[in-house]
Amino acid sequence: MSDKLSTRILVCIGGGPEAYTGLKFVHRLSEESCVDIALLYVRPVDSGLKSGGMEIRVARENVLDWGIELPGMAHLKKAQDILVDLGEISGEIDESWHHHELSGDPTGEFVREYRNACGGRISLRLRTAEDVTTAVVDEADRFEADIIIVGDNTKPVEGLRKLITPRQLSLKIAAHANCSVIVARHLEPGHGHLVCVQNNDLTRAMLPKAVHHAHTCGCPISLLSVAEKEEKRSEAEEAVEMAAQFFRDNGIDPHEQLVEVGDPAEVITELGYDFSLIMVSESEKPWFAKGFSVAHDVAARARNSVMIVK
């Protein structure tokens, strides 16, 4: 996470109703600690406009001049209306769109910008791309996002079906993104966060970000460590105590400390269902193998929201 004064959150709009539900969670973060919010809709390249980026850009600018909404703008407008209802956007609503040039992308993007009451920036962003995952990751890098929120309304896939089922867009983004990603399912504030820890360097690297997020959210924190075998329970207990002490040293008293034995992904998924968010550290595996890691297995199995912390 960067040293910016405010947390920056990129919310992907268009992945189903879960993306809109996540806006309540973003508003909760903004109430607790002023955040910058970008709402992004990525539309696949129009089939009739694939001859080149310049043709796409000129055609889209002409459409805007004619007063016609581009595909995707309605989704962003719906998200904007939700933020207005939540009080995140107030005052006069600017309905104009501005075209921004992007290096390496001749089509650019269309942007509408606001300021919220605390001084944070809110932007609506419309991009066109042949590959949605690449565009989202690129936008997150340009925005210097700390967190990407992407909705996922697909049913969890387990067993042999995982080998033949196309990977969800949310998990593709989580595998390629350089910042933390929340795979959002029923993402509602108020039910606490479950932080999953181990006694290793990955957890130690995650803890400062988990503490920062806890301060930003103001949510109660529970800690969980899972030992695969009973003889490793003591290691799990040490991991939970190490994490608890780190939180206490940073002004947060964990709500509970949990130690369990079993398959980590199964235990985390089961216990995590009662929480608003499950937090797990990213795997060191390369992007093409992350689906076999505990973090991404949990994100694929869970019926609620999972944050993969990077």
Language model regions located:
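Short, well-ordered alpha-helical scaffold segments within catalytic/effector domains
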Residues: 133, 167, 204-207, 265
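Short Asp/Glu-rich motifs
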Residues: 49, 102, 159, 233, ...
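N-terminal start-of-chain detector that recognizes signal peptides
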Residues: 9-12, 96-98, 119-121, 154-155, ...
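Gly/Ser-rich helix-loop-strand patches that form or flank binding pockets
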Residues: 5, 18-33, 128-188, 269-310
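Short amphipathic alpha-helical surface micro-motifs
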Residues: 20-21, 103-109, 164, 175-178, ...
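Small/aliphatic-rich secondary-structure junction motif
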Residues: 2-92, 176, 187-258, 301, ...
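Structural beta-alpha unit
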Residues: 1-4, 81-148, 248-296
